[in-house]
Amino acid sequence: PNCPHAVIDILPEQKSIEGLGGNMRLGGRDVALSPDTQAWRLLGQTDSVRMRFRHRYEVDPQYIDSLTAKGLVFSGKAPNQPIMQILELPDHPYFLATQAHPCMTSRPLEPQGLFLGLVAAARQHACPDQDLPGPVQAAQKVNQVKSTHKHPGEKTDVRKRKRVKNS
């Protein structure tokens, strides 16, 4: 806050908020994904996803161009605001960061794509001599299973990733 170049700073709309809950961006938010990025591939090759957030900081928009000029990719953004939600380095095996909490949308039988990518990248790094699926391949396999997996007495609305009771 008292530095000359605050690349990461508190969200402008949050600066004047005080009291219960404080100055946080909370809850479910849509994230627009950039095509052909690792985040886009891990999260199902879709234009946008709904993710859960609990943060108060952002990349100061005046630094975005200089960061992207050096190779950083902001692959997930707030749809109608200059808030960067996911970033990655494309030339790294798995350098991906998010403001979201993937743990809030991950389930034991339906792991969130960013977690799958992390585990697959760690396995590949730990066992380079084994033929293991990479982060994207692992997420794609699980997404295929998710779209066909049904629990007894339930059906899955794949678009919303929500289970509903059969009538």
Regions found by a protein language model. Give the residues of each.
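Amide-donor transfer/coupling interface in amidating biosynthetic enzymes
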Residues: P1-S167
